[in-house]
Swiss-Prot record:
This is Succinyl-diaminopimelate desuccinylase. GO terms for molecular function: acetylornithine deacetylase activity; cobalt ion binding; succinyl-diaminopimelate desuccinylase activity; zinc ion binding. Its cofactor is Zn(2+); Co(2+). The gene is dapE. Catalyzes the hydrolysis of N-succinyl-L,L-diaminopimelic acid (SDAP), forming succinate and LL-2,6-diaminopimelate (DAP), an intermediate involved in the bacterial biosynthesis of lysine and meso-diaminopimelic acid, an essential component of bacterial cell walls. The lineage of its organism: Bacteria, Pseudomonadati, Pseudomonadota, Betaproteobacteria, Burkholderiales. Binds 2 Zn(2+) or Co(2+) ions per subunit. It comes from Acidovorax sp. (strain JS42). Keywords: Amino-acid biosynthesis, Cobalt, Diaminopimelate biosynthesis, Hydrolase, Lysine biosynthesis, Metal-binding, Zinc. PANTHER family: ACETYLORNITHINE DEACETYLASE, N-ACETYL-L-CITRULLINE DEACETYLASE. Pathway: Amino-acid biosynthesis; L-lysine biosynthesis via DAP pathway; LL-2,6-diaminopimelate from (S)-tetrahydrodipicolinate (succinylase route): step 3/3. Coiled coil: none annotated. Homodimer.
Length: 391
C-alpha cells in the first residue's frame, strides 16, 4: 500500500464530522514535525462548537536558503466531513475505509482527505529530494469548512494577517476534477450574498380582501422583476451573476386567512463584474419602486476571487501536463470554498483535487488511480514553485 493511500485511510477512519476533528490534526502534525514544520494550534469557537485549526509552516531558513524575499506556498484543507446520512444505506461503514471495484469508499474520501494525504506525502517526497528548498511551505487545516465556516480558516487568516504573515501561492485541496484528477482546476470562485426579505401586509379574512392587505400579492411583481433582472454579463472567467429564491414562508396554515407577512430567502452568486454593495442597492431600488413595506437583512458569505493565469496557474498546469498529459480546464463554477478567505491575503489561489462526483453522497469514494497522480501533481508543483522562488 502506498504511503498516500495509507494516510488517506487513516484519516477516513477518524469520524471527523463538523466541527469534530477526531484527531486528524494531531496525526498530521506528527507527520509534519519531523520534516521541520512548526505546528501551531489556533483552535477557536465556543465549547459547544469548538473548531480545531492547525497552522504548520516550514521555513527555508532551516536550510540556510531563506532570503529577504523568500516566498511561501500554502496548502489549505479541511479535515471535517459532512454527516453520513442513513448509515444503513451505505454499502460499507462510512468510517471504515473499504476497497471495492477499484475505489476507496468512506466519508471524506474525495472531500477532502485524499487531497490532504496527497499533499503531505508530496511534501515528504519533495523534501527528501530537495533538502534545501528555497521556499517556505505551510499547511492551513481546519475542522470547520463544511459547517458555518466562522471559526475555521477565517479566524486563522485574521491572525496571520494581524502578525504580517506573507502568503504568495495557495493550493486548496477541494475536489475540483470531473472525470480524472487534473482535468479541471478552480482559479476563482463567485461571491455569495444572501438576503431575507420580510414583506408586511395586513392579516384578514380571505373573503374580505378589502379589509386586509395581502403581502404575497404585493411581493409577487417585485419578485418577478428581480428574477428577470440581468445583473451583469459576466466576463471571460465568470458566468453572469445569478439571483435565486430558495424559500418562501407565508400564511398561518389555514386556507381562509390572508397572511400578515411573507418571508422570502434569496441568494446571489456574483461575478467580479458586480459588488455586494451594488447588488444590495439595486434590490432595494426595486422593492422601493414597488412600494413595499418590508425589512431586509443581508449576509455576505464571501467575495468573489480570481487568480488570472500566472506563476501558480502555470506551475499547476505544467505539473498536470507532465503527470497526466492533460490540458487542464480553468473554471470558476460551483459553490464557495475557504479560498474566499485566503484570497484576502494571498494574491494567487487555486483549487485542485480529485473528481467530485460522489462528494456528500452515500458511498462517497475516490478512484484508487486518482490518488497517486494527485500526489505527484502536488510534488511537481512544489518543484516548479521552488525554482521560481530561487529565480
Amino acid at each position: 500500500m502506498s504511503p498516500t493511500l495509507l494516510l488517506t485511510e487513516q484519516l477516513i477512519a477518524r469520524p471527523s464530522v463538523t466541527p469534530d476533528d477526531a484527531g486528524c490534526l494531531d496525526l498530521l502534525a506528527r507527520r509534519l514535525a519531523p520534516l521541520g514544520f512548526a505546528c501551531e494550534r489556533l483552535d477557536s469557537g465556543p465549547e459547544n462548537f469548538r473548531v480545531s485549526n492547525l497552522w504548520s509552516k516550514r521555513s527555508a531558513a532551516l536550510s540556510g536558503q531563506a532570503q529577504a524575499a523568500t516566498k511561501t506556498v500554502v496548502f489549505a484543507g479541511h479535515t471535517d466531513v459532512v454527516p453520513t446520512g442513513p448509515v444503513e444505506q451505505w454499502s460499507s461503514p462510512p468510517f471504515t475505509p473499504t476497497h471495492r471495484d477499484g475505489r476507496l469508499y468512506g466519508r471524506g474520501a474525495s472531500d477532502m482527505k485524499a487531497s490532504i494525504a496527497a499533499f503531505v506525502v508530496a511534501v515528504e517526497e519533495f523534501l527528501a529530494a530537495t533538502p534545501d528548498p528555497r521556499l517556505d511551505i505551510a499547511l492551513l487545516l481546519t475542522s470547520d469548512e463544511e459547517g458555518p465556516s466562522v471559526d475555521g480558516t477565517k479566524v486563522v487568516i485574521e491572525q496571520l494577517r494581524a502578525r504580517g504573515e506573507r502568503l504568495d501561492w495557495c493550493i486548496v485541496g477541494e475536489p475540483t476534477s470531473v472525470e480524472q484528477t487534473g482535468d479541471m482546476i478552480k482559479n476563482g470562485r463567485r461571491g455569495t450574498l444572501s438576503g431575507r426579505l420580510t414583506v408586511r401586509g395586513v392579516q384578514g379574512h380571505i373573503a374580505y380582501p378589502q379589509l386586509a392587505r395581502n403581502p404575497i400579492h404585493q411581493a409577487v411583481p417585485a419578485l418577478t422583476e428581480l428574477a428577470a433582472t440581468v445583473w451583469d454579463m459576466g466576463n471571460a472567467f465568470f458566468p453572469p451573476t445569478s439571483w435565486q429564491m430558495s424559500n418562501i414562508h407565508g400564511g398561518t396554515g389555514a386556507t381562509n386567512v390572508i397572511p400578515g407577512q411573507v418571508v422570502i430567502d434569496f441568494n446571489f452568486r456574483f461575478s467580479t463584474e458586480s459588488t455586494a454593495e451594488g447588488l444590495q442597492q439595486r434590490v432595494h431600488a426595486v422593492l422601493d419602486r414597488h412600494g413595499l413595506e418590508y425589512d431586509l437583512t443581508w449576509t455576505l458569505g464571501g467575495q468573489p476571487f480570481l487568480t488570472t493565469p500566472g506563476e501558480l496557474v502555470q506551475a499547476v498546469q505544467q505539473a498536470i501536463r507532465a503527470e497526466t498529459g492533460l490540458e487542464t480546464e480553468l473554471s470558476t463554477t460551483g459553490g464557495t470554498s475557504d479560498g474566499r478567505f485566503i484570497a484576502q491575503i494571498c494574491p494567487q489561489v487555486i483549487e485542485l483535487g480529485p473528481p467530485n462526483a460522489s462528494i456528500h453522497k452515500i458511498d462517497e469514494n475516490v478512484r484508487l488511480v486518482d490518488i497517486e497522480p494527485l500526489k505527484n501533481i502536488y510534488r511537481r508543483t512544489l518543484e516548479h514553485l521552488n525554482a521560481l522562488a530561487g529565480a
